[in-house]
Every structure is written in C-alpha cells, then in structure tokens.
Amino acid sequence: MTDDAVREFHRLHAAGCFVMPNPWDVGSARALERMGFRALATTSAGLAWTLGKPDGTLTLEEALAHLAAIAAAVRVPVNADLEGGYAVDPEQVAAHVTRAVGTGIAGLSIEDASHDPDHPLLDLDLSVARIAAARRAIDESGTGVLLTGRAEGFVVGRPDIDETVRRLQAYAEAGADCLYAPRISSLDHVSTLVAAVAPKPLNLLVNAPFTTVQEAAGLGVRRISVGGTLARTAWRSFLRTAQQIADGDFTSFADLPDVDGLLGDPRG
C-alpha cells in the first residue's frame, strides 16, 4: 500500500459513483486493473472456493496472505473483505485489523453476522464496539485505511430495513467511513439507505441484474461492488465446459481469450 493508494481510495468515495469489482486471485486482479477499474475489492467467497472450501470457512492467516498477494500485485486501491474480523471480541478484531492494514490494503470492511442460526446478527452494542475497535486500530496505525461497516440482516434472513438503517447509522457514528448492507435489491431500500447514512457513502452490492451503474448513481450510491459474482461466473463457465468435455464435446475450445496478452510478461 502507498499513501497515494489510500488517498485515491478516499477521493473515489467523495463524489460520483465508481465500480469496484472483486477479483479472487492475483491473475483476475491484474486483469481487472488492466481493464481500467480504479479500485478492487477482495471476496472471501471467491478466495474460499479457490482453496476448495465453502464460503465462511477461511482462516485469518489465509485471508491475510491473500490480501498481501492482491495488494502487491496491483497499483490501484484494494479493499479487503475481512468478514467479521475473524473474531467476536472487539479487542481481537482490533488486533486483526492491525495485521490487515499491514498487508498493503487501502480499505477494509467488518460485518455483523454471528454465524449462529438462532441469533444470526451480533447484538447491536457489540457490533458497534467492534466497529469502534476497528476504527481505533486504523487510527493508531496511521495508515488512513478506509473503514466500511456492514449490516448483514438481508444476508442472514433478517430483511428488516428499519433495523438495517439503525445499524448502519450506529456504525457511521462509531467511525465507519462507508456503509454497506449486502443483498439489498429494492431501489426504494437503496434510496432509504443512501439518505440514512448521508453524507457518508453507501456501497451497493450488485449480484443480480436489478439496476445499472447509471441508475444507482442517480440514487446517490457512491460505490458498487459485485461480491463473489465474478468468481461465480468463472465457475459457471468452468463447470459447463468441463461437462462438455465429459460428454466428448470440445467445441467450447474455440475463440479462447489471449490471457498471456492481457496479463503481459511479469518479468518485463
């Protein structure tokens, strides 16, 4: 990470709307950078699948190694999907955030899912304390890394827009620079959240064709990410082609992309 990358990441959030796609490895990160995207974000799901694991089973060490590899591979700002900080206790979250900012990232997100099916969201007071601890760790690092607070209600089967607003506003007050509620797909809800967290920026996950960049920007969204969707589309192509091969059909081998040409010679 350079100071320039952190400054650029903050600048991107100040006005307008930008798309921040989610690569799942170094190759996809470099390809996206060369396509002109101005910032990238990691995806815990995409990384887990690459490692042969389901989403939600990454270890802290796996995540940190991945962050360091992606951040070192590109010049654009990288936002880290740090899931729930790989801890529940706020002080442990702070310690893990300190390690994460040392990998070279320009931003990171902390979510409030509990992974307890009976109580899928952490209590609000605890969630706020975790965001505040992450904020303190970033401030003490002197890096200026941008902090995103995530409200996971719509992900974990608690699609309550009022509770989502309450949580995002509390995370903003606790020091989050950007706010994010994944799986929001109602444009009315998007407008509600934009207004609720203003003047701070809102990240919108677009993992289905429910809006466009122009429409989201018109609603006041500042940042668009796609989560694990790019990785899913890669898996879709892989599985379809693998099944065709299993059936003795090699026609999908036509018109393949020049990946070497896209990525260039890393020795050059």
Q: What annotation goes with each model-predicted range?
A:
Residues 2-80, 84-226, 233-239:
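Alpha/beta enzyme core
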Residues 9, 228-268:
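Extended, intrinsically disordered, low-complexity segments
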